[in-house]
């Protein structure tokens, strides 16, 4: 599954991102900038370590991890969270925990595109990426 997600991907559509960011507590200006961003995501592996690099006009971010092992990350919104990534059927699923809250980010292939569903509470955002 991870092999299929390797490569570089450019955001081509985004649904409900502003509401998702609002649910995370992001201010109006950050939410608006986030909606305009068309991030480019590069997923690579080195042995059993997976790296996800995200570049956008808003912020650049990189996480590197092993499946099933907890790691700390600073989210683009500035939250310090503990995250774990696992394979779940056809998806790479990341769970972020911070201050008693939890967000889930599910990455999977659908018709040759990478679909990323991010959820917190009952609010879900869907970003679709096309391979570059």
UniProtKB/Swiss-Prot annotation:
GO BP term (any one): fatty acid transport
Residues where a fatty acid binds: 107, 127-129
Expression across tissues: Highly expressed in adult retina and testis with lower levels in cerebral cortex, kidney and epididymis. In the retina, strongly expressed in the ganglion cell layer and throughout the inner nuclear layer in amacrine and bipolar cells. Not expressed in the outer nuclear layer. In the testis, detected in the seminiferous tubules.
Keywords noted in UniProt: Lipid-binding, Transport
Any GO CC annotation of this UniProt entry: nucleus
UniProt cross-references to CDD domains, sorted A to Z: FABP12 (cd19617)
One function term, GO molecular function aspect: fatty acid binding
UniProt keyword Transport, yes or no: yes
Gene3D superfamilies in the record: 2.40.128.20
Family as reported in the entry's similarity comment: Belongs to the calycin superfamily. Fatty-acid binding protein (FABP) family.
Record-linked PANTHER family: FATTY ACID BINDING PROTEIN (PTHR11955)
Name used for this protein in its record: Fatty acid-binding protein 12
